Amino acid sequence: MFIAVLLGAYSHLETYFLRVEKYTIETEKLPKGTEIKIMNASDMHLGPVMREDRVEMVKRVYEREKPDILVATGDTVDGNMKNLDYLAQMLAELNPPLGKFAVLGNHEYYVGLNQSLDFLRKAGFRVLRGEAVEINNFLVIAGVDDSDGKRLGYRVFTDELEVLKNVDTKKYVILLKHKPRIKREAIKYVDLVLSGHTHGGVLFFVGYTILRLIFETDRGIKELAPGKYIIVSKGVGTGGPPMRLLSPPDVVIVTIKGKGN
């Protein structure tokens, strides 16, 4: 009984132990000496339970790391956002020089698409729904909706292949997709996939056993093909009870370094 109570208490505390997971990727697609820093604040699950403490976690990392781009790979919203516009305003204060981009996760559909889109836009994010945008001379960011929206009867834009096959692959192509899956035939069009959703399984053994069979990985970085990667965040918040065990929350920082001519 004592051990169960101790584990329960620790698993709640762990939800506050935010880690910053840093990765550096080199590419010939950016000129030598060019660096672009991207921050992924995935799975904040903002709503009646996860509130300003989660946004403050994100803001502290943002202010320290000073990313060029801020992305949110789904499940930013998780609940009735009535009277919570101040959370959107807190996020709107973050203004990276190359922009803010988000995609929809499953929870944005569960709690209502319109209020979710409204919140994300008030927070200053451009929501990518089956589209790709050129950021500068070297970078493309694409995003697709989460597939759960279709099951719930929404019109969704989920086909990454349809989006990616039209991008300029001479540029460095990043795909934002909530669940860490990608069609095999789409990999040749993309350089980096940023995802969330898994929470590292919430309990580490769930991630290492079950989720790695379902998704590309439950956390961290995996090479999909030579020079092509997926990076999965364990997320900032939690979608159920605020509990984690050996799967602490994280924010991902990816630095893309050029080594081209």
Swiss-Prot record:
One Pfam family in the UniProt entry: Metallophos
Cofactor(s) it depends on: a divalent metal cation
Annotated binding of a divalent metal cation 1, by residue: 43, 45, 75, 199
GO molecular-function terms, A-Z: metal ion binding; UDP-2,3-diacylglucosamine hydrolase activity
Coiled-coil stretches: none
CDD domains, per the entry: MPP_YkuE_C
Listed EC numbers: 3.1.-.-
Cellular component, GO, one term: membrane
KW Thylakoid (keyword) present: no
Glycoprotein keyword on record: no
Cofactor remark: Binds 2 divalent metal cations.
GO biological process, one term: lipid A biosynthetic process
Keywords: Hydrolase, Metal-binding
Residues the record lists as binding a divalent metal cation 2: 75, 106, 197
Family: Belongs to the metallophosphoesterase superfamily.
PANTHER family the record matches: PHOSPHODIESTERASE YAEI (PTHR31302:SF31), TRANSMEMBRANE PROTEIN WITH METALLOPHOSPHOESTERASE DOMAIN-RELATED (PTHR31302)
Full protein name: Uncharacterized metallophosphoesterase aq_1054
